């Protein structure tokens, strides 16, 4: 996979997770990038 493609997917997952958990701090969302989102 290309690094760019992975970055897009990570941002997508972070946005999706943020939508599910609106109370999650932005710092936590940023920290979750680069790690598997369960």
Curated annotation (Swiss-Prot):
UniProt-listed GO biological process terms: neuropeptide signaling pathway
Gene Ontology CC terms, in alphabetical order: extracellular region
Tissue-specific expression: Produced by the medulla terminalis X-organ in the eyestalks and transported to the sinus gland where it is stored and released.
Keyword vocabulary terms for this entry: Hormone, Neuropeptide, Secreted
GO molecular function: hormone activity
UniProt region (Disordered), positions on chain: 18-38
InterPro entries: Crust_neurhormone_H
Subcellular compartments: Secreted
Protein name: CHH precursor-related peptide
